[in-house]
A protein has these predicted regions:
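Short, well-structured secondary-structure segments
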Residues: 2-9, 15-117, 141-144, 164-169, ...
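Active-site and substrate-binding clefts of carbohydrate-active enzymes
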Residues: 2-50, 182-192, 196, 211-214, ...
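Generic structural signal for well-ordered alpha-helices
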Residues: 53-57, 89-93, 122-132, 155, ...
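Acidic, His- and aromatic-enriched active-site or binding-groove loops in soluble protein domains
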Residues: 88-105, 122, 126, 138, ...
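Short, charged, surface-exposed secondary-structure boundary motifs
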Residues: 114-116, 174-182, 204-206, 287
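CE4/NodB-like, metal-dependent polysaccharide N-deacetylase domain
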Residues: 118-147, 227-241
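Catalytic domains of cell-wall/extracellular-matrix polysaccharide-remodeling enzymes
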Residues: 126-180, 246-264
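Intrinsically disordered, polybasic Lys/Arg-rich low-complexity tracts
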Residues: 410-437
Length: 437
């Protein structure tokens, strides 16, 4: 049996907030930097999404379906594609039409809801699943959480939503001596299969490809194939997971990244040792070799491979607790406009911008970050949250007034109409006696 290569890309663009000052609170409830969102989205579409989608489409056709890939595209990104650059949606539809591309489910707003609210997590995943079905005509059967965040409990929640296959990080501190180049199972739900990212080989492309100071530069397709073969010498599958913006945005076109990706499928297919598979195909093809216990959440972020990139300091924790404390009240109010804003305010990027880690991962945290400091990001976000809280409280108060009035009307005593008196009987008219003649 051939060994498997599973190539997966994350596609996400956040809904960036405008500069929102203290004096805007209670006066202006438009929170978003529409100009920045449109400008950045269109730039990345032209540099990455459109050319890379075309490259993948040509590779699928050239290799007669032997080349396969998988995507997860956040709802926040899909909304911006539809609003600012519909051609991107069309290019993903063309990939979907080949039948060789799998679209995964995730949280609609690329949120941290899996760490805070089971009901909100379920709501977002189901909303995202419905959106993928509407746009691409396929139903997601595999799941990847925001930034590959995973734990045994999160896996169980995904299982309860119908997902038997989950992607996550092959983090060193939970793997120990185990290799990420096998499929594992969730100990709570043993039939749920876990695909683990080979972070070393993935990051060779995502982060080190254009680094001229890297001892292995330049990276060519044949060299990369030899590394994958060595890594999987005694193993079954190599999972290469990375941001889609790697191609043309993080790694510029001048670096040769598109030429590399154009050559890569042919190198693997010609070698004959590997075959490309989608995540769901991998889960069907390979058996789980063992349970993988993950008590505390892991992710693919930073050296720690945990959730400290979003919740590692007091600023992040305060903002996180503040926004998720509103979930219950919002579910009572059930206002569509508030729900839409609430989704955007949950985007994990807002908390990522507040990260104070500036060591080996500092440059990663600065990329796409509109703020000069984490404190500026925190203040701006909390100003927006304060205005949102006012709107939510007002909506709840209006609902209370409405319910009170309805109850008063419902419980008001019914007044009986006074009984009508019977009309007085008239005395019979006495006829005058007839005159005697």
């Amino acid at each position: 049996m051939k060994k498997s290569i599973c190539l997966y890309f994350q596609v996400h663009q956040p809904t960036r907030l405008r500069t929102y000052r203290f004096f805007d609170i209670g006066k202006d409830s438009h929170y978003y930097d529409d100009f920045a969102n449109r400008t950045i989205l269109r730039r990345i579409a032209q540099k990455c999404y459109l050319p890379m989608n075309q490259l993948l489409l040509e590779a699928i056709k050239k290799h007669k379906g032997a080349f396969k890939v998988a995507f997860s595209i956040s709802g926040s990104a899909l909304e911006q594609f539809e609003r600012y650059f519909p051609e991107v949606i069309d290019s993903f539809k063309a990939l979907a039409a080949t039948g060789k591309v799998e679209f995964l489910a995730e949280t609609y707003n690329h949120s941290l809801s899996s760490l805070a609210s089971e009901s909100e997590f379920r709501h977002q995943v189901e909303k995202h699943k419905a959106t993928i079905e509407r746009l691409f005509g396929v139903t997601p059967t595999a799941f990847r959480n925001t930034e590959l965040i995973y734990s045994d409990a999160i896996g169980e929640e995904a299982w309860n939503l119908g997902f038997k296959t989950v992607l996550t990080e092959g983090a060193r501190h939970i793997m120990g001596w185990k290799s990420p180049n096998f499929i594992y199972s969730n100990p709570i739900q043993p039939r749920q299969k876990l695909l683990l990212r080979n972070y070393s080989l993935s990051d060779d492309i995502a982060f080190r490809f254009s680094d001229r100071g890297w001892s292995m530069w330049p990276l060519t397709a044949d060299k990369y194939l030899s590394w994958v073969k060595e890594s999987a010498k005694d193993d079954e599958i190599v999972n290469l997971f990375m941001d889609y913006e790697t191609f043309g945005e993080h790694q510029k076109a001048e670096s040769g990244i598109f030429d590399f990706m154009k050559a890569l499928p042919g190198e693997f297919i010609a070698d004959g040792e590997f075959e490309f598979v989608t995540p769901s195909e991998a889960a069907r093809k390979h058996k789980a070799v063992a349970d993988l216990e993950v008590f505390d959440p892991i992710s693919w972020a930073d050296e720690e491979r945990d959730v400290t990139a979003w919740l590692g300091n007091e600023l992040q924790q305060e903002a996180f607790n503040k926004v998720y404390a509103m979930t219950e009240k919002l579910s009572i109010v059930n206002n569509p406009e508030l729900w839409e804003d609430y989704g955007h305010l949950q985007e994990s990027d807002h908390f990522y911008y507040m990260c104070t880690k500036f060591f080996s991962d500092g440059e990663v945290h600065k990329y796409f970050n509109p703020y000069d400091t984490p404190y500026e990001a925190f203040i701006n976000y909390m100003n927006v949250i304060s205005d949102f809280q006012i709107r939510l409280d007002e909506a709840r108060a209006a609902l209370d007034v409405k319910e009170t009035m309805e109850n008063e009307i419902k419980n008001a005593p019914v007044k009986k109409a006074p009984a009508k008196k019977a009309p007085a009987k008239k005395a019979p008219v006495k006829k005058a006696p007839a005159k005697k003649k």
